[in-house]
Amino acid sequence: MNRLPSSASALACSAHALNLIEKRTLDHEEMKALNREVIDYFKEHVNPGFLEYRKSVTAGGDYGAVEWQAGSLNTLVDTQGQEFIDCLGGFGIFNVGHRNPVVVSAVQNQLAKQPLHSQELLDPLRAMLAKTLAALTPGKLKYSFFSNSGTESVEAALKLAKAYQSPRGKFTFIATSGAFHGKSLGSLSATAKSTFRKPFMPLLPGFRHVPFGNIEAMRTALSECKKTGDDVAAVILEPIQGEGGVILPPQGYLTAVRKLCDEFGALMILDEVQTGMGRTGKMFACEHENVQPDILCLAKALGGGVMPVGATIATEEVFSVLFDNPFLHTTTFGGNPLACAAALATINVLLEQNLPAQAEQKGDMLLDGFLQLAREYPDLVQDARGKGMLMAIEFVDNEIGYNFASEMFRQRVLVAGTLNNSKTIRIEPPLTLTIEQCEQVLKATRKALAALRVSVEET
């Protein structure tokens, strides 16, 4: 039987939510009630699968962990009042920490003036953010298109490459095995995990995948495409594969890919949605090899953990295909004043506090600790790797990885697996993590591994 709409029910639910938003604290009964409501609403109206996923990585199989607020720059507090060191970082959005006061203030100040733009008049913050990114990004990158997410920034990059290369008779895209570029139809065509791809086949034609980090495979693919008339429009890749398991290519790989793109007349699209904004110890990961892409994709941390912001930055030569008709690719909310205020404040914080350098220093400290633990627990840990504050611990099997996340939850440290490699647990904290908190994370990791060893030996 069809359910009839209920304005009264919707009004009551929204009023209840607004009341919660106004509250700073909850008493015990309110916390219990909120937990029950959230679990029920996720089950009935969001997706029950999220509950089972959360159950698999929380202590005691309890999926009732409901976050309530940021505790500090680097911590989260749940409705039970438990504080967790955030080593997940919202999959890389909290580079400048949770509720960074500079970012929050910029957004609040802009909110007091104008939350969204008219769509007709020229909006100043979009212009200022584009100018700032032109100054910040490497090489000849100059023009920016703004969106709301990483997958949107990749979609814009693919369409831009198509618009530029189609008149040249080039329609093929080369991506890499293990890649993750998003889940909308175009970006999913570049993503490499069958779990995400198969339900939506056929995807966009013209995409090929080669092994990541294998420059000879890349050369062969470009050469074979040229021989068959399937000339390559662009190569798209991540400087470090994030969801693939924090996979670092051999030194010099990006440089070699750049040379191949130049040789075959293909554009180089770098997806720095996860590696950008200081995460790896440089503002952009491509700067470790001084590589300059034709198109750069940003999102996640660009909004400072306060607003969703995506950006696709390109050279003038490439971007100029949109000059005659700037409406060829647009989005209603991309580049809105609140998002641009957040992005400008985020860049300011990253530069003022030199957070990329801090990411390098604290990342080295953490990785040294993880490598030492990997040597001590070879029966559990297969590898520890990373660059800056983008790290991973890979376990010998999936179950140990899940159990490790659960044990870390007991230690009040939040971690999770990578989407394309479930054996691998990512360590991706805010760049503002303190030295003391780094030490706490290493202690928690040691305790979690010790508990896992006992558990494995008992089975």
Swiss-Prot record:
Read off the NCBIfam families from this record. Answer: PRK11522.1, putres_am_tran
Catalysed reaction equations from the record: an alkane-alpha,omega-diamine + 2-oxoglutarate = an omega-aminoaldehyde + L-glutamate; putrescine + 2-oxoglutarate = 1-pyrroline + L-glutamate + H2O; cadaverine + 2-oxoglutarate = 5-aminopentanal + L-glutamate
Xref: Gene3D superfamilies: Aspartate Aminotransferase, domain 1, Type I PLP-dependent aspartate aminotransferase-like (Major domain)
Q: Which residues carry this modification: N6-(pyridoxal phosphate)lysine?
A: K300
Protein's UniProt name: Putrescine aminotransferase
Among PROSITE patterns, the record links this protein to:
AA_TRANSFER_CLASS_3
* Cofactor requirements of the protein: pyridoxal 5'-phosphate
Q: Which InterPro entries match?
A: Aminotrans_3 (IPR005814), Aminotrans_3_PPA_site (IPR049704), Class-III_PLP-dep_AT (IPR050103), Putrescine_aminotransferase (IPR017747), PyrdxlP-dep_Trfase (IPR015424), PyrdxlP-dep_Trfase_major (IPR015421), PyrdxlP-dep_Trfase_small (IPR015422)
Its annotated pathway reads:
Amine and polyamine degradation; putrescine degradation; 4-aminobutanal from putrescine (transaminase route): step 1/1
Enumerate the UniProt keywords alphabetically: Aminotransferase, Pyridoxal phosphate, Transferase
Function as written in the Swiss-Prot or TrEMBL entry: Catalyzes the aminotransferase reaction from putrescine to 2-oxoglutarate, leading to glutamate and 4-aminobutanal, which spontaneously cyclizes to form 1-pyrroline. This is the first step in one of two pathways for putrescine degradation, where putrescine is converted into 4-aminobutanoate (gamma-aminobutyrate or GABA) via 4-aminobutanal. Also functions as a cadaverine transaminase in a a L-lysine degradation pathway to succinate that proceeds via cadaverine, glutarate and L-2-hydroxyglutarate.
Q: Which Pfam families match?
A: Aminotran_3
Which EC class does it fall in? transferase
Please, one GO biological process term?
L-lysine catabolic process
Q: Does the keyword Transferase apply?
A: yes
The keyword Lyase appears for this protein: no
Q: Where does pyridoxal 5'-phosphate bind?
A: G150, T151, Q274, T332
The record's GO molecular-function terms, alphabetically, read:
diamine transaminase activity; identical protein binding; putrescine--2-oxoglutarate transaminase activity; pyridoxal phosphate binding
**Family assignment from sequence similarity:** Belongs to the class-III pyridoxal-phosphate-dependent aminotransferase family. Putrescine aminotransferase subfamily.
EC number, UniProt record: 2.6.1.82, 2.6.1.29
